[in-house]
Amino acid sequence: MSKSFVTGFPRIGEQRELKFALESFWAGKTSFGEVEKVAAELKKRHWNYQIDAKVDLISVNDFSYYDLMLDNIITFGAIPPRFAGLSGYDLYFSMARGNANSVAMEMTKWFNTNYHYIVPELSRDVKFNLNSSKIIAEYKEAKEAGVLNAKINLIGPITFLALSKTTDGSNALDHLDALSSEYVKL
């Protein structure tokens, strides 16, 4: 028997709540805590829409403050060296938007659509290291919100590598075994 699910729910909000919360934070008008409140409200609302629509499996980890590929970069520790020393949302948004010391990561079209994603930057020296905190936190958040049939969404390792660029001429797909080992840990 087939099961219904949504591969990814639009995350910005019907009134573009996430966009406005992020812009206010970036302008220094609000704290990141305010962005987190908006995000929590949106996730809960979106899960409830799916529950009300009788969707069989409710997607979690389909929410992102900026980009799901960027989330995967963080999750698997593929952070370019120029962002060393940063952490938390400073790291996350510096990778996406740049900062005074480092240029932002490149963006390109997701499978020829109008959506742009952050392009992972890999080299022979990349050492993948799983940080599943976002995924686990969102899964627990969904369960606490009453989602009984949660399904984790995640960009797969082949897609991640195929859409990456290398900074040293190496082949991104040469990292498949190492990256897959981190996926297995999930």
Show the residue positions of the predicted features.
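Domain-level signal for soluble alpha/beta catalytic cores
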Residues: 1-186
